[in-house]
From Swiss-Prot:
Entry protein name: Cytochrome c6
Gene: petJ
Residues at which heme c binds: C15, C18, H19, M61
Summary of the function given for this chain in its UniProt record: Functions as an electron carrier between membrane-bound cytochrome b6-f and photosystem I in oxygenic photosynthesis.
UniProt source species: Chlorolobion braunii
Post-translational modification: Binds 1 heme c group covalently per subunit.
Length: 89
């Protein structure tokens, strides 16, 4: 099971520069809100699609595969999913 505490730490240290508070400082409409993830993420709103995006990047977002390990990617994906699913952003 993914570690949400690890995911939050990874998010805060690596993702928050562009995605603080679930937003997007580069492309404002492409937030980490559930509706935006459903609309813009290849594969829709699910853990696998979030993992794919983190690993491979897209557009202005860099690929994190090789920069974060498997547990870190799983954790941050679970954290993003949990925050968005619960409208916690």
């Amino acid at each position: 099971e993914a570690d949400l505490a690890l995911g939050k730490a990874v998010f805060d240290g690596n993702c928050a520069a562009c995605h603080a508070g679930g937003g997007n400082n580069v492309i404002p409409d492409h937030t980490l809100q559930k509706a935006a993830i459903e609309q813009f993420l290849d594969g829709g709103f699910n853990i696998e699609a979030i993992v794919y995006q983190i690993e491979n990047g897209k557009g202005a977002m860099p690929a994190w595969d090789g920069r974060l390990d498997e547990d870190e990617i799983a954790g941050v994906a679970a954290y993003v999913y949990d925050q968005a699913a619960g409208n916690k952003w």
